[in-house]
Amino acid sequence: MTGDLQAAEVILCCGRGLQNKRNLNLAFRVADCIQAQIAGTRAAVDLGWIPANREIGLSGARVEPQIYIGCGVSGTNFHTMGMKHAKKIIAINTDPLAPIFQIADIRIEEDVCKVLFALMHTFSEKNSLQPSSIHHPSVDELLAFFDR
């Protein structure tokens, strides 16, 4: 994982709600597809899924991307202190009481893998229509996907 979290336009943050490394690998593939920087919660770091230098929160980085996508992130105060100034906060979680939903601009109460597969399919399909050049979605295209 490379890239500067502070300079990122789009951050895909992985939380314990991803449940396992297979789902984490899906998140990595989606991040690559949409040109997002990968980050994680303290729980994801403690599980060894994400390096400590990619943690967002009180004991990690404070970021202000155009879009923050929380995948299986519950949204403890320690975490939200590091990302609450994102321009758009998109939260994907099956728990309707997840604290992150209180600050999210877009709330998706659904299985995170289902949403990630749809996201990857949408933008991979656009790439197959333009085989000569890889199309990475703009911030507006990503927001349009989530606003449906």
Stretch-by-stretch model annotation:
Residues 1-148:
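N-terminal glycine-rich FAD/FM-binding segment characteristic of electron-transfer flavoproteins
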